[in-house]
Amino acid sequence: MIREVRREDIPTCVNLIRSSFITVAEEYGITKENAPRFTAFAISDDRLYWHMDKEHRPMFVAEEDGVLCGYCALLIQENGECELNHLAVLPQYRHRGIGKQLLEHSYTVAKSMGCHAMNIGIVEENTVLRKWYEQNGAVHIGTKKFDFFPFTCGYLRREL
């Protein structure tokens, strides 16, 4: 079941995001030392409370049998576009369609809020994730290398 994040869910969501993103960090040699701004290391309760209270981001969780097992959020932009943030599924819940449900829910919500496109950022070297987004309607639009990350940022876009 996909539902909106409640305030009391925030600490659990932070742990869920960390647990999900740390698998990517481990696979691609991303550490707190070489990429302190990577989601696995930079996410915090305060940051998610800020997203909820100050930025009013739509935030969603997937819940199965009382367990919060997936998360994502949207950053709505003034140009009619939005950005998908922190799509995460706990490792033990992967390959069950939860990520796809969250992604499709995000597409629907973004469109209902007047967005005409969704932008998505990934670790470009994660070709499995890139292919998954492409299979779910996103188009790869480019890459960018930042000095503060030991990986290349990949960008995808889905017209809504």
Predicted regions mapped to residue ranges:
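A short, internal acetyl-CoA/4′-phosphopantetheine-binding micro-motif in the GNAT/acyltransferase core
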Residues: L87-R94, I122-E124
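C-terminal "cap" of GNAT-fold acetyltransferases
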Residues: H116-R130, E134-N136, G142-L160
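Conserved G/P- and acidic residue-centered "switch" motifs that form tight phosphate/ATP-binding loops
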Residues: G97-G99
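Acetyl-CoA-dependent GNAT
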Residues: E4-I10, N15-H86, L90-P91, L103-H105, ...
